[in-house]
């Protein structure tokens, strides 16, 4: 078979390409598959930094998340920087882009998943919640956070306590803290 490759494809490896290339089939996951059992989900709304999305997928594999659900305006998961930052997790973590993010949140809730929004206005700290049951964490845009509509859909707004003058954490870091607290609770 002959393949025509884009010039930008080489940007995946900046300096020392290994001369290896692979052709893989794009995943076709469904939200309903991710809702089975006792799901631990990450719901990503309008994230724009490919490194953040890749880090979330990589962390998700390490934490054993059931899936990553993304809004249509989230950065392309097949962006070379995203792929590179997943360190291969893109091939092992279920993910799906949904056309109607609000409806996806509703579907999660109807399936018995409690949806938590990482939010600066959260009254509760993340440590005071029970994540041993079906759980999803909403993670918003790096600069703007979650949209008002999605924030209102959340079952509970939670926050990570901050010291000093820091207002918030990087989206991938915040997601990691929340997800690993859920993992800790599920393994006690």
Roles of regions detected by a PLM:
Residues 19, 62-63, 77, 82-90, ...:
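Structured adenosyl-cofactor binding patch, chiefly the S-adenosyl-L-methionine
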Residues 1, 96, 158:
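General small-molecule cofactor/ligand-binding pocket signal
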Residues 116-166, 170:
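Active-site/ligand-binding-proximal alpha/beta "capping" segment
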Residues 22:
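Glycine-rich phosphate-binding loops that contact phosphosugars or nucleotide phosphates
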């Amino acid at each position: 078979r002959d393949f025509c490759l884009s010039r930008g494809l080489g940007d995946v490896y900046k300096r020392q390409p290994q001369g290896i290339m692979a052709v893989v089939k794009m995943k076709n996951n469904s939200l309903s598959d991710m809702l089975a059992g006792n799901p631990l989900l990450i719901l990503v709304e309008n994230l724009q930094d490919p490194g953040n999305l890749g880090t979330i997928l990589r962390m998700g594999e390490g934490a054993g998340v059931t899936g990553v659900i993304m809004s249509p305006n989230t950065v392309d998961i097949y962006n070379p920087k995203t792929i590179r930052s997943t360190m291969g997790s893109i091939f092992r973590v279920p993910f799906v882009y949904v056309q109607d993010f609000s409806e996806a949140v509703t579907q999660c809730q109807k399936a018995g998943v409690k949806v938590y929004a990482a939010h600066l206005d959260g009254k509760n700290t993340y440590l005071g919640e029970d994540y041993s049951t079906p759980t999803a964490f909403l993670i918003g845009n790096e600069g703007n956070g979650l949209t008002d509509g999605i924030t209102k859909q959340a079952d509970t707004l939670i926050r990570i306590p901050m010291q000093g003058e820091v207002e918030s954490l990087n989206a991938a870091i915040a997601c990691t803290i929340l997800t690993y607290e859920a993992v800790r609770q599920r393994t006690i």
